[in-house]
Each structure stands twice: as C-alpha cells, then as structure tokens.
C-alpha cells in the first residue's frame, strides 16, 4: 500500500523524479503530442517547408477554423502537434519575443535564438509546482541571413535541429518516409512534395486540399508564405495524392 502511494506521488508531482529518474508528467505530455495530428518540417537549400494534417473530426466543422501553422514573424513559421490551446499560448509567446527583439535591437530575431527562448519558457513548466507541462510539440522553421533553419521543441523544453522531421501521430511512419526520400539538394518545390507525400503515406485514401496546411519560408525572400487551397491541390494532383470523390464517400 505504501509503495502504491509513493508511486502516485511520483505520478502526480511534476517536480518529483521517480527512483529511476523519470518525470511522469512530462512523459504524459509527450503522449498528448502523439495524439495530435501530424506536422512535417523539411529544410532545403532554397528554404523551409512546414506542412500539417488538419483533417476535421466532422464534415460539419469549418476547415478554415482548424489552424496548425502560424506566422511568428515575417521570416518564421511555426507548426504544432498536440493540445491546440497550449500551442496557441506558445505561439503568442514566440510572437512577443520576436517583436521585443525588433524593438530592442532593430533587427529580426534569429531562429535558434527564438527556439531557445521558447524552450526555456517550456522548461520552466517542468520545474514549478502548481502548473503542468505544455502538451504540445512545435516545429519552428525560418530563414536567418539566407540560411534555412528547422527546429523541434518537445514538452521537456529540449530543442532539436533537423533536416526533416515529423511530430504528432504516426511519427515513426512519417519519419521513415522522410529518411528514405530526403536529399540534401532538394528544391523548395520538392520539399513541399516530400512533406505532402509523408502526410499521405499513412492514409489509405488521398488527401484533400482543405485537409492539409502548407507554408514556406524562402531563402531568397526570407518571407513566410501560406499556400492557398488551389496551390495545394495542384501539388497533390501532380503527385497523385489528391483525394477522389470515391475516397471522400468512403471516409463518410
């Protein structure tokens, strides 16, 4: 009985390590990320691609109300997987830090600098009592002085830099597809195609344009740009990934 009570203390206490060195609440937050729909990031010499699966849970839901990719600054985009409300809080924090940097130094914030400020903020919530970890992972992508950068954050507050990465549901399958098909010399268009192929790789049906978000930050312009549904549809159609009417009827 006493052992069970001690186990529950480790389980519930965010600031208490278990005897084997684990923080259970942080691990549970990682499980929340796995339950979220996938987001994919691809870094190419021509820029960064962010793509997110945003298939709605019901045909009655407005697809435009589901946002998975956000603009943090003119040259930075953020994609999320996990609790949407937690993601919104972190994205707002990232936007504030970006603006503070512009006001203080008169220049855009660096991608690595912003990522570390966000992860420092996340990490504080793994050490403070009376709070819980953020149940979300982020992909922070952008261009800094002509160099594309792509980072992942996780609920522990650890940053990782990637060439291509997936977060959220089916991460293992998506990551396997990325590892098999990624090349260091990908163009930006090929990066978009790879991200869409990775998302589609875990679905028996095709992908609808309103079921996925895609954004890029070009190394040439250093500008965050979201693709329209028509542009996404053209990429899906060109790569034989577009959902047909038969697929949509099957889903329903």
UniProtKB/Swiss-Prot annotation:
Modification after translation, per record = Acetylated. The acetylated form at Met-1 was shown to be in 100-fold excess of the unacetylated form with the initiator methionine removed in whole cells and purified 20S proteasomes.
Free-text activity regulation comment from the record? The formation of the proteasomal ATPase PAN-20S proteasome complex, via the docking of the C-termini of PAN into the intersubunit pockets in the alpha-rings, triggers opening of the gate for substrate entry. Interconversion between the open-gate and close-gate conformations leads to a dynamic regulation of the 20S proteasome proteolysis activity. In vitro, the chymotrypsin-like activity of the alpha1-beta proteasome is potently inhibited by carbobenzoxyl-leucinyl-leucinyl-leucinal-H (MG132) and significantly by N-acetyl-leucinyl-leucinyl-norleucinal-H (calpain inhibitor I).
The alphabetical list of record keywords is: Acetylation, Cytoplasm, Proteasome
User: Which subcellular locations apply to this protein?
Assistant: Cytoplasm
Induction of expression:
Up-regulated at the mRNA level during transition from exponential to stationary phase. However, at the protein level, PsmA 1 is expressed at a high and relatively constant level throughout growth.
Give coiled-coil spans as residue ranges.
none
* Effect of disrupting the coding gene: Strains lacking psmA1 gene alone display relatively normal growth rate and overall cell yield, but they are more sensitive to growth on organic versus inorganic nitrogen sources and hypo-osmotic stress, and they show limited growth in the presence of L-canavanine. Abolition of alpha1 subunit synthesis also has a severe impact on the ability of cells to withstand thermal stress. Moreover, depletion of psmA1 and psmA2 together renders the cells inviable.
Question: What temperature behavior is annotated for this protein?
Answer: Optimum temperature is 75 degrees Celsius for the Suc-LLVY-Amc hydrolyzing activity (with the alpha1-beta proteasome subtype).
Single GO molecular function: threonine-type endopeptidase activity
Where in this protein does the record say N-acetylmethionine is found?
1
Principal cellular location given in the protein's record:
cytoplasm
SMART domains linked = Proteasome_A_N (SM00948)
> What SUPFAM superfamilies is this protein classified in?
N-terminal nucleophile aminohydrolases (Ntn hydrolases)
Tell me which Gene Ontology terms the entry assigns under biological process: proteasomal protein catabolic process; ubiquitin-dependent protein catabolic process
Per the entry, what this protein does is:
Component of the proteasome core, a large protease complex with broad specificity involved in protein degradation. The H.volcanii alpha1-beta proteasome is able to cleave oligopeptides after Phe, Tyr and Trp, poorly after Glu but not after Arg. Thus, displays chymotrypsin-like activity, low caspase-like activity but no trypsin-like activity.
What's in the misc comment field?
A: H.volcanii proteasome requires high concentrations of salt, similar to the extracellular environment and cytoplasm of this organism, for complex stability and optimal activity.
Q: Which NCBIfam families match?
A: arc_protsome_A, PRK03996.1
Q: Which family does it belong to?
A: Belongs to the peptidase T1A family.
| Oligomeric and partner information | The 20S proteasome core is composed of 14 alpha and 14 beta subunits that assemble into four stacked heptameric rings, resulting in a barrel-shaped structure. The two inner rings, each composed of seven catalytic beta subunits, are sandwiched by two outer rings, each composed of seven alpha subunits. H.volcanii produces at least 2 types of 20S proteasomes: an alpha1-beta proteasome and a proteasome containing all three subunits (alpha1, alpha2, and beta) that appears to be asymmetrical with homo-oligomeric alpha1 and alpha2 rings positioned on separate ends.
**What protein does this entry describe?**
Proteasome subunit alpha 1
């Amino acid at each position: 009985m006493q052992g069970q009570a001690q186990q529950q203390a480790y389980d519930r206490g965010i600031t208490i390590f278990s005897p084997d060195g684990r923080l259970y609440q942080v691990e549970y937050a990682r499980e929340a990320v796995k339950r979220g729909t996938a987001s994919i990031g691809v870094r190419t010499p021509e820029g960064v691609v962010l793509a997110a699966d945003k298939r709605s849970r019901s045909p009655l839901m407005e697809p435009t109300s589901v946002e998975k990719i956000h603009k943090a600054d003119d040259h930075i985009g953020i994609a999320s997987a996990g609790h949407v409300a937690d993601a919104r809080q972190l994205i707002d924090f990232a936007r504030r830090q970006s603006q503070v940097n512009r006001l203080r130094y008169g220049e855009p914030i660096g991608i690595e600098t912003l990522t570390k400020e966000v992860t420092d903020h996340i990490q504080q919530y793994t050490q403070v009592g009376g709070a819980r970890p953020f149940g979300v992972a982020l992909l922070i992508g952008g261009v800094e002085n002509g160099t594309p950068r792509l980072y992942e954050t996780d609920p522990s507050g650890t940053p990782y830099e990637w060439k291509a990465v997936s977060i959220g549901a089916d991460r293992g399958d998506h990551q396997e597809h990325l590892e098999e098909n990624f090349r260091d010399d990908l163009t930006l268009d090929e990066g978009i195609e790879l991200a869409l192929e990775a998302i589609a790789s875990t679905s028996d049906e095709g992908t609808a344009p309103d079921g996925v978000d895609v954004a890029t930050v070009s190394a040439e312009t250093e500008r965050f740009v979201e693709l329209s549904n028509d542009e996404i549809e053209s990429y899906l159609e060109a790569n034989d990934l577009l959902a047909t009417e038969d697929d949509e009827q099957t889903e329903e």
